[in-house]
Amino acid sequence: MSFATLRPAPPGRYLYPEVSPLSEDEDRGSDSSGSDEKPCRVHAARCGLQGARRRAGGRRAGGGGPGGRPGREPRQRHTANARERDRTNSVNTAFTALRTLIPTEPADRKLSKIETLRLASSYISHLGNVLLAGEACGDGQPCHSGPAFFHAARAGSPPPPPPPPPARDGENTQPKQICTFCLSNQRKLSKDRDRKTAIRS
């Protein structure tokens, strides 16, 4: 009578049919890698499904680009450039309109932006002195016949000091301040007088 020796089957074979124990090499590799995965191997179909889910989740979290913001920086740069171009065009248009209001000789004289602002300030002061002097100024130089416009027009400011008496001959006097627009008016008046004199003669 002979007896057959039966080997007991591993318990995991019946409890977990889809899980097979790792070999010694795989077990060592998992220990050396430092991962938290369990020392078992899941069925191939289940692994593929979980890997696809991980990749899809990574794409959603990452947004398809570095930092999760694809194309946002170029759009912001284009918007900033367009805003700067609009601002520059507005400034240039305003300076062009201001330039047309300032009389110069010659009329088509090229002016920089700082020259345009300075001449505009001088022209406003000159027009204010023209209004203050009125017809009392016959020499075409209202800026030298009375107080400066910015002193008279400033609200709450004390009255300007009286003009100094005319200097005598031989006394050292400071050079007169020249207004460009007064000088231009004086030249026009001189030309008109010469023309009238030539017509009469």
Curated annotation (Swiss-Prot):
Biased composition (Gly residues): 59-69
Stored Pfam families: HLH
Any one GO CC term of the record: transcription regulator complex
Compartmental location: Nucleus
Occurrences of domain bHLH (ranges): 75-127
Comp. bias intervals (Basic and acidic residues): 70-88
Annotated region described as Disordered, given as residue ranges: 1-92, 148-177
GO annotation terms (biological process): BMP signaling pathway; cell differentiation; cellular response to cAMP; cellular response to follicle-stimulating hormone stimulus; cellular response to mechanical stimulus; cellular response to transforming growth factor beta stimulus; chondrocyte differentiation; collagen fibril organization
PANTHER family associated with the record: BASIC HELIX-LOOP-HELIX TRANSCRIPTION FACTOR SCLERAXIS, BASIC HELIX-LOOP-HELIX TRANSCRIPTION FACTOR, TWIST
Role, per record: Plays an early essential role in mesoderm formation, as well as a later role in formation of somite-derived chondrogenic lineages.
Name this protein carries in UniProt: Basic helix-loop-helix transcription factor scleraxis
GN (gene name): SCX
